From Swiss-Prot:
SUPFAM superfamilies: Ribosomal protein L22 (SSF54843). Keywords: Mitochondrion, Ribonucleoprotein, Ribosomal protein, Transit peptide. It comes from Mus musculus (Mouse). This is Large ribosomal subunit protein uL22m. It is found in: Mitochondrion. InterPro entries: Ribosomal_uL22, Ribosomal_uL22_bac/org-type, Ribosomal_uL22_sf. Component of the mitochondrial ribosome large subunit (39S) which comprises a 16S rRNA and about 50 distinct proteins. It comes from the Eukaryota. CDD domains: Ribosomal_L22 (cd00336). GO terms for molecular function: structural constituent of ribosome. Pfam families: Ribosomal_L22. GO terms for cellular component: mitochondrial inner membrane; mitochondrial large ribosomal subunit; mitochondrion. GO terms for biological process: mitochondrial translation. Belongs to the universal ribosomal protein uL22 family.
Length: 206
């Protein structure tokens, strides 16, 4: 008799436990849970091409054209791409293409293709008269998707490998490149260090 009563109570508790678990663990509705990897893809860089500036005043120098272009989800490391992106920063478009032409790295050819696309876009969409009258104002790389995959080892073991992707962003500005900055000497660095020490303050005081 007691055993039958316990079995009935156990049978009643299990469904109640399942109902309680489904009600309490459901924090968000299923439609609000994003399982795709497209959330980290922002299109703000391309939208900068649609910025409309106010009309310029008479006698004001002409505002140079700005071209924003990028390529996303490149099967390449963002750190390797950063070195190439930094190399062409501040160069004219012709000089950058010449430097990338003789670079044997995979990312150099990708950046070259992006620069040629941006150059065509400048002439076609941004009223740039001379395609060589452009310089690279900004050039950088960003982190893309990072997919985890299984790497099979011997004796039934395995490891986790990552397939990394990166983004490349470039901004072209009409006109010649700005002159390079004069490198600081040791005396200039010493003066900056002394000025930094003199400008120190004690926090939480009058």
């Amino acid at each position: 008799m007691a055993a039958a009563l316990l079995r009935e109570l156990g049978a009643l508790r299990v469904p109640n436990l399942r109902i309680w678990a489904t009600q309490t663990l459901r924090v968000l509705p299923p439609s609000c849970i994003h399982t795709s990897a497209s959330l980290d893809i922002s299109r703000k860089w391309e939208k900068k091409n649609k910025i409309v500036y106010p009309p310029q005043l008479p006698g004001e120098p002409r505002r140079p054209a700005e071209i924003y272009h990028c390529r996303r989800q490149i099967k390449y490391s963002k750190d390797k791409m950063w070195y190439l992106a930094k190399m062409i920063r501040g160069m004219s478009i012709d000089q950058a293409l010449a430097q990338l032409e003789f670079n044997d790295k995979k990312g150099a050819q990708i950046i070259k293709e992006v620069l040629l696309e941006a150059q065509d876009m400048a002439v076609r969409d941004h009223n740039v008269e001379f395609r060589s009258n452009l310089h690279i104002a900004e050039s950088t790389s960003g982190r893309g998707q990072c997919l985890k995959r299984i790497r099979y080892h011997g004796r039934g073991r395995f490891g986790i490998m990552e397939k990394v992707y990166c983004h490349y962003f470039v901004k072209l500005v009409e006109g010649p490149p700005p002159p390079p900055e004069v490198p600081k000497t040791a005396v200039d660095h010493a003066k900056d260090y002394i000025q930094q020490l003199r400008s120190r303050t004690i926090i939480h005081t009058l």
